[in-house]
Amino acid sequence: GTSIGRDRAPRRRVEDGPAGAHGDARRRPHRAPAARVQPSGPALFMDYDLEAEFKVMHALSTTSVPVPAVLFVETDTSFLGAPFLVMERVDGDIAADDPPFTVEGWVLDLPEEQRALLADNSLKAMVDLHNQNIVELGLDNIGHGNPELSGFDRLIDYWAKKSEWVLEEKNPTISAALEWVFENKPDDTDSNVLSWGDARLGNMIIAKDQSVAAIIDWEMLSCGPRELDLGWWLFLLKHHSVGVGAELPSGFKTRDEEIARYEELSGHKVRNLHYFEVFAGLRMAILVARAASLLKSAGYIPKDSPMALINPATNLLAELL
């Protein structure tokens, strides 16, 4: 069902589906709420789908995957000027991106054994997500782009369109990577799991015992092979270390160790990973190019800044091609 206010658009509430692992929202006290408001002006992403994010988090609340308890999503823009999603606040720490956790912050302050526990727990949470049955959860056709295309083809098509939307000048690395991704697409990309999209430590809320309290930030959600998230995960670890001239902190696994641990935890033999690391680099480079455009428009960087062409993501992507 839906809850409809006076002359308001339908508001989807958590009561619309099963109560789930977090309990029935109607029968228990809520924690302090937090709202995720869709950008109303120029933004990083070409489109947003808070209803899809609501659907995913609500469905996952019935599983062992840690997600914030969602309360409702509101599509009526008269309240806050844009659609918004309301969920319960989750206490914990978040690994920083700017400067990255590899350079300073609470992750570096942890003893090495605690850092190793954090790194392993974060990978376990992603494996747990990938192990969920998306058909049973009703999430097997979720994601951005043309729904008439199958999982991964839909995603490639979407990011090709996004690159056209983003690029204001020629970007040889992105163009070469996009061509490479289309020409080298593996034949076996039909293995569909729920892909978090922006799969990285910085999008997890970490409890004091270094367990994952919640997986957050689902703007890039889709369906696809497990390697879709794993490739992004590994590329971002490299981006936050080699890409910025820093070392991966002790306690974190090397690339090969991380792959082996993923296989051990999941029982899945990782394949075509180089392809998905290139695809991760392509997506990250497109996002950085968009960020550069937004920063120029806002006057934070000069109009002739080479940020869209020269940045850690694009540099690492060029090395992978």
Model-based region annotation:
Residues 8-176, 180, 184-189, 209-210:
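ATP-binding pocket architecture of kinase catalytic cores
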Residues 191-196, 201:
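Catalytic-loop of the protein kinase fold
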Residues 204-206:
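Hydrophobic residue at the +6 position relative to the catalytic HRD Asp in the kinase catalytic loop
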Residues 216-221:
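Activation of the activation-loop gatekeeper triad in protein kinase-fold domains
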Residues 266-275:
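Acidic, serine/threonine- and proline-rich low-complexity regulatory regions
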